[in-house]
Amino acid sequence: MSKNKSSSSKTSKTSKSSKKDVFDFTALNSDQLQNVDHNDPKLLEHLKLGPLSMFEDIDNDQERYNKMKQAFFESLFKCVALEQYRDKLFKEMTTINPEDANEDAKVKNSLKLEKEEGSDEKSKKSKKSSKKDDSDDESDNSNDSEESEAEDSDQESEKKNSKSSSKKVPKKSKDNSDVEGSDSEEESPKSAKNAKASKPAAKKSSKKQDSETEEDSESEKKSSKKVAPKGKAPVKANKKKNDSEDEDSGSDNSEEESEEPPKKASSKKPPSKSSKKAQSEDEDEDSGQSESEHSEEESNSDEDSGQSEEESEEEPPKKSKGAKAKPVAKTAKKTPAKKNSKGR
């Protein structure tokens, strides 16, 4: 108990004295720490108050105390050195040199300028592209307008052409021939003249037919029996017509009338000698008349052919009828001759 009291009294005394005289390690550099005197009373008091105060028997065990003191100082130096090095690094990291600061500022400024230039270039490109698009749209619109105008002009020209073509419709002449433009205007008076010339020719042919029918009826009345059909003189006239290729409708009517009598002659008796003489005389008269008629018809046909070629193209089909009827007249002539011979 006495020992404990004495130790407690000592510690109380040392604590009072330590407050006054405390060894400050923070004020020392690493070199100063290395040169500290380990036997310094201040240091010892500090150690006793601090890290070595836990050991109660430190005064009695001197050897142990010395070992602990050495280890403490070694670790202390290491800690101090590390702390000092840490402080230096912190200061170096926090403090920036002006040169480095200027370089950093230059770098930052250059980066900003590059960004601004890039944005300017992008804006210029976008503007150029927008202008190109606008120009393309304008060109497309102009092309579309030109195309529409061209189409409108084409439609107008087509309408004009259609109107002009409708005005110039091919007119059919009296001969059913298509005529257009100025040709129709030039040929129309010719066709009119030809039509006018054909009318008197048709009238003449009708008059000739009437006269021929009257003469035939008179000749039939004179003869007591029906006369055989006329054959020889019309055949010669038909040969002349085929050579000239111009005949009238009058000969057709006369030939058709000549075809009818054979039917009646077949039912009657053969003619007598007096009737044969009268028949021969009538045939001579008829042949003379037919030749004169054919000569007149040829002159008329020449005039008609000089006036218009189109009428001459329409007349041949009528002539073909007369040409077909003539062989029938020949056969009709032969039949009564055979009957007469049999009758004799």
Swiss-Prot record:
Source organism (scientific name): Acanthamoeba polyphaga mimivirus (APMV)
Low complexity biased stretches: 191-200
Biased composition, class Basic residues, residue ranges: 265-276, 331-344
Start-end of Basic and acidic residues biased regions: 103-123
Annotated signal sequence range: none
Superkingdom as given in the UniProt entry: Viruses
Record-given protein name: Uncharacterized protein L201
Regions of compositional bias (Acidic residues) in chain numbering: 135-155, 244-259, 281-314
Region (Disordered): 95-344
